[in-house]
């Protein structure tokens, strides 16, 4: 069997969105499925990671990208004043009117490239992975033009997205366009793969024509091979990843400031938004706060492994934060260091932390609960009682990325 995987994010792009398509393309060939990948040639990535390499097992193809820069609005405006800031805001306004998202500008080159590959290589099925939501439009177009089955892989919800700022008029205006995409996926995809039950429920709400399966993200244990934990002189708690949407570090920062713990250092790999940096400065945290720039994937894994604990922050956002256990939690689980999870208590991430015994769950806005959890982890560290490897062999196998890709392969072969 031959498949074409269409993704906006692929090495040398960096960031969390790269890992699922990268690992899919890495492991599918070992299961007897010839894998072709179509990715942009230069999408002006939000992050670039030259240490990440495309898998040699897959055939990687590129289609020209002519769209806007893939940067967060806050980063686009950071440090700009006067006319430069006005021009940057105008560019952002252009991005915001593109429906369903700015990456729709890749379609004029991506769709013809995908169709050529299908016909030239004898592709049997196309997989699109989103976000960006517009990747689903490519899948629908390829199916219509070639007749091959389409599998829509949803790494995040299309409508029920906890990180989207629903209080903003521009976002509300996009809701109808996004609903049309969900309806398209439900009506046209031969199969839908979702990383959580709640995302699959979003599709089922629109009476899908094809099968819907939940295949969560997985742990890449091999990525941590050779990375060691060495107990530090201070209690190091690490957050890896960017802050966007409603993700809010302030309850944790307040809890740290009021904890009375002077030998704790909170490391934020990827930094904070400017407003949150200013907030943190007002708390007088001093050397208890370490802000690091965007790091390569490998360096971020080193930090996660060599930490007394890792910090997971997910917003509630009127219940939408329960939708998906961020891919970051699987990195944290693979690092096998305790997790302080400030997440919706009834959500998928909280369930994973509890089931694996990986750490402590508190509500994302519960400063008192976060402070008590931090003090408790610190006390266990002082007593030499922090676990270093808490997953059983059965849990490791069930959570592994290889097991997840095997499920996808089974689905593909059934089409």
Q: Residue ranges of each PLM-predicted region?
A:
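A charged, aromatic-enriched C-terminal amphipathic alpha-helix characteristic of glycosyltransferases
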Residues: 364-369, 382-414
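N-terminal subdomain of nucleotide-sugar transferases
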Residues: 1-68, 191, 212, 259, ...
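Nucleotide-activated donor-binding/catalytic signature segment of Leloir-type glycosyltransferases, i.e.
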Residues: 270, 275-301
């Amino acid at each position: 069997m031959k498949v074409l995987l269409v993704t906006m994010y692929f090495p040398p792009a960096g960031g969390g969105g790269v890992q699922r398509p990268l690992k899919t393309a890495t492991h599918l060939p070992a299961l007897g499925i010839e894998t072709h990948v179509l990715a942009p040639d230069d999408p002006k990535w939000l992050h670039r990671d030259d240490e990440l390499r495309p898998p040699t097992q897959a055939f990687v193809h590129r289609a020209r990208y002519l769209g806007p820069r893939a940067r967060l609005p806050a980063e686009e405006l950071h440090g700009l004043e006067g006319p430069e800031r006005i021009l940057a805001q105008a560019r952002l306004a252009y991005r915001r009117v593109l429906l369903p998202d700015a990456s729709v500008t890749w379609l004029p080159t991506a769709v013809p490239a995908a169709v050529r590959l299908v016909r030239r290589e004898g592709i049997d099925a196309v997989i699109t992975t989103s976000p960006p939501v517009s990747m689903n439009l490519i899948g629908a177009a390829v199916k219509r033009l070639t007749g091959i089955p389409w599998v829509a892989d949803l790494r995040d919800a299309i409508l029920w997205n906890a990180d989207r700022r629903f209080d903003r008029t521009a976002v509300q205006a996009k809701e109808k366009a996004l609903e049309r995409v969900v309806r398209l996926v439900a009506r046209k995809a031969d199969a839908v793969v979702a990383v959580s039950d709640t995302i699959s429920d979003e599709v089922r709400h629109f009476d899908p024509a094809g099968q819907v399966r939940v295949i969560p993200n997985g742990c890449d244990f091999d990525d941590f091979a050779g990375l060691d934990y060495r107990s530090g002189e201070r209690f190091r708690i690490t957050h890896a990843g960017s802050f966007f949407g409603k993700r809010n570090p302030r309850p944790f920062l307040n809890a740290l400031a009021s904890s009375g713990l002077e030998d704790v250092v909170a490391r934020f790999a990827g930094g904070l938004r400017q407003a949150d940096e200013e907030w943190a400065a007002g708390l007088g945290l001093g050397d208890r706060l370490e802000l690091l720039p965007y790091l390569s994937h490998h360096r971020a894994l080193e930090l996660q492994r060599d930490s007394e604990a890792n910090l997971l922050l997910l917003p509630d956002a009127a219940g939408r934060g329960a939708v998906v256990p961020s891919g970051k939690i699987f990195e944290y689980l693979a690092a096998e260091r305790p997790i302080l999870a400030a997440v919706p208590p009834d959500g998928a991430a909280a369930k994973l932390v509890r089931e694996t015994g990986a750490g402590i769950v508190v509500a994302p806005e519960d400063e008192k609960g976060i402070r008590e959890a931090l003090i408790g982890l610190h006390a266990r560290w002082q007593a030499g009682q922090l676990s270093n490897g808490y997953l059983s062999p059965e849990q490791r196998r069930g959570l592994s990325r290889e097991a997840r890709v095997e499920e996808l392969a089974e689905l593909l072969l059934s089409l």
